[in-house]
Design a protein with these regions (language model features):
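Eukaryotic short linear interaction motifs
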Residues: 50, 75-77, 145-146, 169-170, ...
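Cullin-RING E3 adaptor/co-adaptor recruitment helices
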Residues: 1-24, 174, 191, 216, ...
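A structural signal for leucine-rich repeat
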Residues: 7-10, 30-37, 54-61, 78-108, ...
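Alpha-helical scaffold repeats of the Armadillo/HEAT/TPR superfamily
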Residues: 180, 200, 233-236, 281-289, ...
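Flexible loop/turn segments at the boundaries of HEAT repeats in alpha-solenoid HEAT proteins
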Residues: 30-31, 54, 78-80, 126-127, ...
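LRR N-terminal entry segment and analogous cap-like coil->beta motifs
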Residues: 1-45, 64-65, 90-92, 110-115
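Concave beta-strand-loop units of leucine-rich repeat
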Residues: 19-25, 42-48, 68-74, 90-93, ...
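Alpha-helical solenoid repeats of the armadillo/HEAT superfamily
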Residues: 65, 105-111, 129-135, 149-159, ...
């Protein structure tokens, strides 16, 4: 609001070329900008503007050479109530046409004009005026006068004519044939518009191509064609894919000496022709034609571009793309250009999933992959509907999370949590929880703490409670506990949030309701192991109820040794606090210690692990002590197992955290068990 008024003084900031496409601003704002000697001005789809803006633009009539007013219905129509800044254009269709002021007649230097979607009753001829220098006229979705002769006033100057969705009649086609200087002609239409259209005949096409000898680009997309426009099987040239006009499968083009630079055939039966005499062709059949269509129509025809992107989606789903880099760039461009167009977002996000698959990854530069992620997040932000959310989440799964999302980590997390906080399909929720889990895995404490403050823990626990209420233990339930395990890793604040939100009763309920779900048990015990590592939080675990459960889980063989290992780790930290902290909790401390010794003795030291340590600090703190020998033994066994099975990964980590020195110091302790010393020497 009012931003453009900052540019009202040319001496402070000189502007010549300005694009305000799809901006929402007032007549008064544009009036301030008209103090500039503007040369080019794009006001496409600035729907709030009225006839007052056109009067303001008259101050630029001596400098303005290009003006785009496509999708500005009120500019040529005086709204009821006058042309004041407070007037609206909501009922522009029923408003009376403006008088002589609503005309471009005084803009004698204009060479490019784009109009479209004009209200009924607007006199197109009067709105345009004479415009003696006009070289390009683009009309779109506008009711044309019955008499096309007004076009002939520019027969000597017009190089480009666009009549998209104008329903060009045979009379107009005959008039166009008299515009001998035309290089570009667009008589395409959108099938979705539903307007009656007379099929183009072989004679009409021949008339255009013979009457326009300089024609370089012709768009016929969306039109229907009468019989006889293509050659019969006997007349077909023996070659295929030729651009030579003499080989053309479309009869009318055989009269040309040179192929066209561009030919639009999207949504037509001619797109399947064997030989098309043009270097760039839009169509639906081949990948190249589809990509050309996306490129040609993205800017001003989002609905057509959406249809073309859907064609690309179908092709990419069943076969490998031949131009994957170009395809991805075009889809990203369309999604960025039409962030709030639902059709583009739905088809574009679906296509992205296939275009970012692993088979194409090596061809994608880092900058492009980041652009893909940005448009995916834009789609998630703009649309809450299931289709877009699912497509966007699936596409994110094709990327390295969290590393490739580092540049937008906070935003991505907020958007995923927003999806999970709203009712949605289980399939979308499953993917979103999986991504949330990946986001908090292998990131530093600062990231985890920030995510915790966003409500991550609360959201996961809400999902778990809902699944528990339905007595359902599925991937969503397991992923949610896994996410809680990851976000609480060495992050005391998040551990505390879990406890404050009644996490321990939730753990017991899940354990009771799903006694045979091994993956669930492993994830829950991993989380509680993180809680047990926080000294200030261990008193919350030091109850008879919890200690009884933990000690019973020492006997579990669920998921190999994982559940028993995690339960033992929790108890190791609790025993490390000493007799005083244990108090009168049952079972007694010495009995729990015996069970821990027995459990550790049963474990296979060569077991492969479903666990990932970023630091050994919580384990190493149990080494230099004599309060709990079994805690010391568990820590030593853990190190022994990890560096035996994964030496390349964990030996450097142990050395970097001073582990060997701590183990050497332990060897001289008379309270250390012999088995513990044996493991320590090997380590």
């Amino acid at each position: 609001q009012g931003f453009l008024r900052a540019f009202s003084e040319p001496r402070a900031a000189r502007l010549q070329r300005v694009s305000l496409r799809e901006f929402d601003f007032s007549d008064a704002d544009l009036d301030a900008l008209c103090n500039q000697a503007l040369v080019e001005l794009d006001l496409t789809h600035c729907e709030q503007l009225t006839a007052r803006s056109l009067r303001s633009l008259r101050r630029c009539r001596r400098s303005l050479t290009a003006l785009a007013l496509l999708g500005c219905p009120g500019v040529f129509c005086e709204p009821r109530g006058g042309a004041g800044d407070s007037a609206t254009t909501g009922d522009a269709d029923s408003a009376g046409a403006a008088g002589r002021d609503a005309s471009l007649a005084c803009f004698e230097r204009l060479r490019f004009v784009s109009l479209g979607a004009l209200p009924r009753g607007v006199d197109v001829c009067g709105a345009l005026g004479s415009l003696p220098a006009l070289g390009a006229l683009h009309l779109s979705s506008t009711e044309l006068p019955e008499d096309p002769s007004f076009l002939l006033r520019w027969s000597a100057t017009l190089r480009s004519l666009g009549l998209h969705n104008c329903g060009a009649t045979p009379a107009y086609l005959r008039a166009v044939c008299l515009l001998g200087e035309l290089r570009h002609l667009d008589i395409s239409r959108d099938k979705a518009v539903g307007q009656q259209c007379v099929p183009l005949t072989r004679g009409a096409l021949c008339g255009l191509l013979q009457g326009l000898p300089h024609l370089e680009a012709l768009d016929l997309s969306g039109n229907s064609f009468a019989e006889g426009c293509t050659v019969g099987p006997d007349e077909e040239a023996p070659c295929a894919g030729s651009t030579d006009p003499s080989d053309s499968s479309i009869v009318a083009f055989r009269c040309r000496a040179q192929p066209l630079q561009f030919l639009g055939l999207f949504g037509t039966t001619l797109g399947t022709a064997r030989n098309i005499p043009a270097h760039v062709v839009t169509g639906e059949e081949s990948e190249a034609h589809v990509l050309n269509a996306i490129e040609a129509y993205t800017d001003l025809r989002p609905e057509v571009a959406s249809t073309a992107i859907n064609c690309l989606f179908v092709l990419a789903r069943v076969s490998r793309c031949q131009q994957p880099l170009r395809a991805l760039q075009l889809v990203v461009s369309a999604l960025r250009r039409h962030r709030y167009n639902r059709h583009v977002q739905v088809t574009g996000s679906a296509a992205l999933f296939y275009l970012t698959g692993s088979e194409y990854r090596a061809e994608h530069p880092e900058t492009l992959r980041r652009q893909v992620l940005s448009v995916v997040l834009n789609g998630m932000e703009a649309y809450q509907e299931v289709t877009v959310q699912r497509n966007c989440c699936l596409t994110l799964c094709n990327f390295g999370v969290p590393e490739e999302l580092e540049f937008a980590y906070g935003r991505a997390t907020r958007l995923l949590l927003a999806i999970l906080q709203q009712p949605t399909q289980d399939s979308v929720q499953r993917i979103a929880v999986h991504l949330c889990n990946a986001l908090v895995c292998q990131v530093d404490h600062a990231h985890k703490e920030a995510v915790g403050r966003m409500g991550f823990v609360r959201t996961m626990m809400k999902i778990i409670r809902y699944r528990l209420l339905r007595k359902t233990c599925d991937q969503v339930m397991e992923f949610s506990w896994s996410a809680l395990w990851n976000i609480t890793d060495e992050t005391p604040d998040n551990c505390k949030i879990f406890l404050m939100l009644n996490g321990m009763p939730l753990f017991l309920e899940c354990l009771h309701e799903f006694p045979r779900k091994q993956e669930l048990h492993r994830n829950m015990l991993g989380l509680l192991g993180n809680v047990a590592e926080v000294k200030s939080l261990r008193p919350f675990l030091m109850t008879t109820q919890f200690v009884t459960v933990f000690s019973e889980l020492l006997e579990s063989d669920a998921d190999g040794i994982e559940v028993s290992y995690n339960a033992c780790g929790m108890l190791a930290h609790m025993l490390h606090d000493g007799e005083g902290a244990w108090g009168d909790v049952r079972p007694p401390r010495h009995l729990v210690a015996q069970r821990m010794w027995s459990a550790i003795a049963r474990w296979d030291a060569s077991s492969r692990r479903n666990i990932n340590y970023r630091s050994f600090e919580p384990i190493l703190r149990l080494i230099p002590q004599s309060v709990s020998p079994v805690s010391q033994h568990w820590a030593t066994w853990a190190l022994y197992n990890l560096i035996t099975v994964y030496p390349d990964k964990y030996c450097p980590l142990l050395i970097s955290e001073n582990g060997p020195q701590l183990l050497l110091g332990m060897l001289g302790s008379h309270t250390t068990h012999a088995d513990t010393k044996e493991k320590a020497r090997w380590v």
